[in-house]
Amino acid sequence: SVSAFFVGSMTHSVNPGGENWIWESQLEVREEWPTITNNQGTKIYIAPRQYLLQLRCKQTPSRSEISEKISQIKPLITSTHNYTAAPEPLNSLNSHFQLLEQEAGKYLYVNLTNISSQIIRKKIFNHILDVFEDSYSPKKLWIITGHRQAQPKCYETTSKDAVLKALLTAQAKITEMELMGRASPPWIYKATVLLTHMAMNRQQAVRPERYEQQPRQNQVNQKNIKAAIINKIYKNKAVPPPSPTDTISSTESWMEEVNQIEKQHTTHSSSTKITAKRTGDISPQQGPSKRRALSPLITETTSTSSSHHQTQEETAQESEPESPSFLVQQAQEMQKRLSLFPKLNFSGTTFSIASVTVSKQSISMEIKSNNN
C-alpha cells in the first residue's frame, strides 16, 4: 500500500467528495482576509488561495514505482514547505501540500494552499514535474481565490513552462491561458491521498521590516559618494605644494590642456560631478593653512543618472583674492592631485576622475563610477 505523511505521522484514506482535498482557512468575506500595509500606508488584502495541478498518465507506473517517487518528493517538501521562507501575510493561515490520485493512477493532483511565496510554489511544482516526468505530463491548473464556492479559474498547462507561468504570473496577465469551456472541478470526486504535509515553523515566518519614510538607495549612495570624494581629494594633507617647474603661464593654456583630457575621457555612463565654485569674498581664517589653495567657499553638487534629485552642501569656508593667478594655482594643485588619485574607492565602489574643466569663476571635475 501507499502511505502518506501528515506533519510527521503517517495516514492513508479514500473518501468520496471533497473531504480529502484539504483547504483550511477559507474565507468568504474580503474584510477577513490577511492584510499587509505597504510603505505608503495602504492596506492590501491578500486572499487565501488553492493551487491545484492535474497530471495525466502517459504510461501507468507500478505501485512500487509510485512509492519510490513519493520517497523522492518527501525531503524537498519537508525542507521547502514551511513558514521559515514564507513571507507575510498568508503565514497566519494553515498551509497544506497534498499529492492525490484518481481513477487508479490515471490522474495525479498536486494541491497547495495558502502559500504567498513564489519561490516555494516554484520549487515544489518544479520538483514534482521533474520526478514524474517519465510517467505523467501536466494538463490543467486550477487557482481558487478566497473560498471554494468562488468562481475557480482553470488554465491549460500542458508543459512545465506553462505551469510555472500560471503559478508565478498575475492572473490578469494570463487570460489567454484560461479555459473558458467546461472543466469539471476534480475536488467534487473521490480521490486517494498519497501524501499530505502541513507547513510548520510559523513562529519563524518572514516578516520584512517596513518604514513609512524609507530613504531611496540612490539618495544614500549620493551621500556616501560625496563623503568619499571630500575625504580623498579635498582633505588629503599629504600632497606637496605645486612645484615652480609645473607653472602654467595662463588660465587659457590650462584650459587648452584640460579640454584635451576631457575629449579623451568623456563618457555617457552614469557619473558623479563635483563642482568647486567661487561664491564671494569671505575673510580668511587666521593662521597658516596647508590647504589654502583648495579652500574657498565650495558648493558641491552631486548628481547621478538614476536620480532626479540634487543635493547641495557647503563644505568649507575660506577665501583667496579673486585673481587669474589664484585660479591657475588652484588648477595646478588640482592637476597634481589628479595624478595621485587616479581611482577612488568607497564601500566597494570604485571611481575614476574622468575630466576637469576650469573657467575664470570655477573648476569642475567629473568622477565616473567604474562599477557601471
Curated annotation (Swiss-Prot):
Region (Disordered): 259-326
Bias (Low complexity): 299-309
Protein's recorded name: Non-structural protein NS2
Organism annotation: Aedes albopictus densovirus (isolate Boublik/1994) (AalDNV)
Lineage: Viruses, Monodnaviria, Shotokuvirae, Cossaviricota, Quintoviricetes
Gene name of the record: NS
